[in-house]
Design a protein with these regions (language model features):
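Active-site glycine- and acidic-residue-rich loops that bind
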Residues: 17-19, 44-59, 116-118
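Auxiliary Fe-S-binding modules of radical SAM enzymes
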Residues: 54, 65-175
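Short, solvent-exposed loop/turn segments at secondary-structure boundaries
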Residues: 10-14, 49-52, 86-89
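Helix N-cap and loop-to-helix transition residues
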Residues: 4, 19, 48-49, 93, ...
Length: 175
């Protein structure tokens, strides 16, 4: 979510998730366990995204050095302003997100880059041909969302509401 240790405590003040070192060192535990693919990401909007992404890149380099047999994926989910909910501290534009994806592709040409349904369909369709390696489809964002109805506790809003079949058709149409 963020590599800013002091601010992390603000977002997770209690419980197991509140222990910053436990969260960050979780990637080492996965590597030591021989996990085939490890996904990393920072929640864009909590803190300065350039700092968070730089820290994640350094962390990725460390993990690659120590757990070279593991595959890695990254994502950069953006918080969006929404009435009545937590407001992002920093807003990232579409152009900045595209530049970040391009930069990360240059930084690590083997890393999988995922783009979530938080992004709109037009952006996802374009970025899929320019640097992203996977895009989600048909996502549910509420706890237990695939098993329970109706949606009650949505964690974030989905911008691309296409079904998996519709996303598949869009990808096929791109060639």
């Amino acid at each position: 979510e963020t590599y800013h240790k002091d601010r992390y405590k603000v977002y997770h003040p209690k419980g197991m998730k509140s222990i910053f070192e436990w969260r960050v060192n979780g990637f080492d535990r996965m590597g030591q366990a021989g996990v085939h693919k490890i996904g990393m990401g920072v929640l864009i909007g909590l803190e300065d995204w350039r700092t968070d992404v730089t820290m994640m890149a350094i962390h990725l380099q460390y993990l690659r050095k120590h757990y070279w047999q593991t595959r890695y994926s990254v994502n950069f989910p953006r918080m969006r302003p929404s009435e009545g909910h937590f407001q992002p501290n920093v807003i990232m534009t579409d152009k900045e997100l595209a530049q970040l994806i391009f930069a990360f592709r240059i930084f690590d040409h083997d890393v999988d880059i995922s783009v979530s349904t938080r992004e709109n369909a037009k952006f996802r369709d374009h970025i899929a041909t320019l640097g992203a390696t996977s895009i989600s489809a048909g996502s549910k964002t509420d706890p237990g969302g695939y098993a329970t109805y109706p949606q009650a506790l949505e964690q974030f809003s989905v911008s691309d509401e296409r079904t998996p079949a519709e996303v598949e058709q869009a990808v096929k149409a791109m060639g």
